[in-house]
């Protein structure tokens, strides 16, 4: 099993560069277990999802039940406390098996913002539910129609109003928003012309979309060549609790 993924690759590299290259632990047991799980979701399953523009709910549930989507979450919050290389191995194996990890990869890495920058209360409230799959954190609202790679030019605003923030603006190419309970949202809390640096004045929020979807949040699907669940989002005086702020305002 090692020779198939680890030693064989190392041998090929050694022939090219003239010395033996040793990979770190390649998570072979995890890869084999993920590959076995993926046999229940063959090409016909993925073709049907694409044909129907459907979200692979059964596949995501199977990954969640097996604990793979909580791989990077610490054990104290119900996760597996695995390193980032293990997360990469899981996603690689899904793709190697013919699946589509894009349907669920955000559940693994987006939570890192909460883990590294969230308050203790936010971690206790959200991470255990993200770990067991009862809450989906699949969406990350960053890109806008007028700001793609230049994130500092985004126009979505979040204005403090008492115990809330009021959000107005638009996001585009936000994947899986229709199938997510929570969303990380990047918005400007201080006008750009009032900031010493253009990277200042931006804040991150953890939005519970269940509370605002269909009211002050409108989600419109974008049809693309691939079944990637892309959407555009419209915020119309969307009111969220001040406790939704992750980390320090403007930083």
Segments (PLM) and residue ranges:
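A short, Trp-centered hydrophobic/proline-enriched beta-strand micro-motif
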Residues: 133-142, 186
């Amino acid at each position: 099993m090692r020779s198939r993924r680890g030693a064989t690759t190392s041998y090929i590299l050694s022939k090219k560069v003239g010395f033996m290259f040793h990979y770190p632990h390649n998570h072979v047991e995890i890869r084999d277990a993920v590959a076995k799980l993926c046999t229940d979701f063959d090409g016909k399953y993925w073709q049907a999802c694409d044909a129907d523009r459907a979200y692979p709910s059964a596949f995501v549930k199977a990954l969640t039940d097996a604990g793979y989507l909580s791989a990077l979450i610490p054990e104290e919050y119900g996760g597996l406390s695995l390193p980032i290389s293990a997360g990469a191995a899981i996603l690689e194996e899904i793709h190697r098996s013919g699946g589509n990890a894009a349907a669920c990869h955000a559940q693994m890495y987006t939570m890192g913002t909460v883990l590294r920058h969230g308050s203790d209360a936010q971690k206790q409230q959200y991470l255990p539910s993200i770990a067991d799959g009862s809450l989906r954190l699949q969406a990350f609202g960053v890109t806008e129609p007028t700001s793609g790679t230049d994130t500092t030019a985004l126009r979505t605003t979040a204005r403090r109003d008492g115990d809330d923030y009021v959000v107005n603006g638009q996001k585009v190419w936000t994947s899986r928003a229709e199938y997510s309970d929570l969303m990380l949202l990047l918005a400007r809390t201080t006008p750009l012309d009032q900031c010493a640096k253009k990277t200042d004045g931006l804040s991150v929020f953890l939005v519970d979309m269940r509370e605002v979807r269909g009211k002050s949040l409108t989600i419109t699907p974008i049809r693309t060549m691939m079944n990637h669940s892309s959407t555009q989002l419209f915020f119309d005086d969307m009111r969220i609790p001040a406790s939704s702020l992750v980390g320090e305002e403007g930083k």
